Every structure is written in C-alpha cells, then in structure tokens.
Amino acid sequence: MGRGRVELKRIENKINRQVTFAKRRNGLLKKAYELSVLCDAEVALIIFSNRGKLYEFCSSSSMLKTLERYQKCNYGAPETNVSTREALELSSQQEYLKLKARYEALQRSQRNLLGEDLGPLSTKELESLERQLDVSLKQIRSTRTQYMLDQLTDLQRKEHMLNEANKTLKQRLLEGTQVNQLQWNPNAQDVGYGRQQAQPQGDGFFHPLECEPTLQIGYQPDPITVAAAGPSVNNYMPGWLP
C-alpha cells in the first residue's frame, strides 16, 4: 500500500520546523546541483529562512549574471521593460498618494475627537462628530459596567467560598472541643448513671422501717400482753424436767 496524501501546512512546533527546514533545504540544494550537472542547465536557487538568513546556489560563475538573464527574459525587450517600469512607478505613486490621504484623514479625525481643530467643521460634521462621541461613550460605559459586574460576581463567589470554609472550621472546632471534654472527664457519664440507679435502691431499703415501727431499737413490749401470753407458755413442759 502506498502512502496517503499528506496535508501541507505550517509546522507549529518550533524545533520540528527548524529540523524540517534544514533537511528540506539540503535536499533542495542537492537536487539543484544534480539538475545542473545531469542536464547541463543553468540553475539559480535563493532561500531565505524565517530568521532572514540567506542560502543560495548558482550553477554559473555569478548569481548576478543569472539574475540579469532572468530579468531580460521576464520583461522582454528594453522598450517593453521601460514601459512596464513606468507603469509600475505610476501605480506605486498613486498608491502612495492614497495612503497619504488616508493617513491625513485619520490624523484629522483623531484631533477632532480630542476637541481640536473644530473651527473648519460645518454643522453637519459637528453633529456627526457628536453622534460618534455618544456611541463611543455608550460603548465605554457598557464595557465599564460589564467589567464591574464581573468583578462583583467574582467577589460574591469568593465571599460564598469563605463563608462555607468558616462554617466548616466552626464545626470542626466544636467537635474538637467536645472530644477534649470527654478526654479530660471520661467518667462523667458513668457517675451520673450510677447516681440515678442507686437512688431507687435506697428508697426500697428504708421503706420497711416506716411500715414496721416495732422493729425500732429500744422498744419495750406491753407487760399486759406478756402476762396474757404467760399461761400458754407454762402449759408446755419439757420432757427433761422432773
């Protein structure tokens, strides 16, 4: 399979462009030399690099002679050459006059926009100048307003980001404070829980004392009750008595 067509375009990479230029330049000079030797042709080759460096090859003894021969062949006879030169000079002069008039008009317009040299202007020209200034002021104000709005939007975005970061830092600070409190007093919750559980047990322990007052220390039984209970005690005779 043959190679496909390669699109010719400028090489963007500077180093690759320089390397390709050196290779193609040497190849082109070699081809020009081979053409002049093999075919006995008069060949002149002029190359300027992108940096302005000159590379040339001429198969004859002088590049100037080859260029003179080229001019004679290109412009024809001397009469034709003179007429062509005159036409070229006339065209160049006309182009120069046009560019000069354009430059002077731009300079005059710039001075008028700055408020200078307004005396020669007519009423219509002054009105046109005023409209131009109004349009320019509107564009300037619109650009300034848009720039200020963009700055305000950017500041609001930064403010929102700072507020979110502040909230996050406050939350982390609060969590860190709680963790430090638990580390300094790890039994705080256990002590409170023990107190809550011990209170019902104390109430149940002392509750029978209130219901049975006869169990109090230093209580003397009623003698009548003891005397009544005496006969029942005497009716029982142990077996070891005589």
UniProtKB/Swiss-Prot annotation:
Entries under InterPro entries matching the protein: MADS-box/MEF2_TF, MEF2-like_N, TF_Kbox, TF_MADSbox, TF_MADSbox_sf
Keywords: DNA-binding, Flowering, Nucleus, Transcription, Transcription regulation
Disulphide bond pairs: none
Main location as per UniProt: nucleus
Keyword Transcription: yes
Top-rank lineage group of the source organism: Eukaryota
CDD domains: MADS_MEF2_like
CC annotations in GO: nucleus
Domain K-box: 89-185
Any GO BP: positive regulation of transcription by RNA polymerase II
SUPFAM superfamilies membership: SRF-like
Subcellular location: Nucleus
Molecular function in Gene Ontology: DNA-binding transcription factor activity, RNA polymerase II-specific; protein dimerization activity; RNA polymerase II cis-regulatory region sequence-specific DNA binding
Function as written in the Swiss-Prot or TrEMBL entry: Probable transcription factor involved in flower development.
Protein's recorded name: Agamous-like MADS-box protein MADS4
